Design a protein with these regions (language model features):
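Exposed, flexible binding/inhibitory loops of compact, secreted disulfide-stabilized domains
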Residues: 1-62
Length: 62
């Protein structure tokens, strides 16, 4: 799994890709507004994303 696979995708495209790969999707922020903080626990099946102008601009695989 590579974080670059998710970069530039829309929220829906990212969610669909996560579902295809059996990963947990977590939206951290959208256009600078924080929705959820980054989790403190570590997992191998979670994708945390930040969106700007409708596209994924930051991905943290946890």
């Amino acid at each position: 799994m590579n974080s670059y696979d998710f970069m530039g995708l829309t929220k829906k495209e990212c969610q669909d890709l996560c579902e295809q790969r059996n990963l947990i999707f977590r939206l951290i922020s959208k256009d600078g507004d924080i929705y959820l903080p980054y989790p403190e626990d570590r997992r191998t099946d979670r994708v945390c994303v930040e969106l700007e102008a409708g596209k994924v601009t930051k991905v943290v695989l946890q």
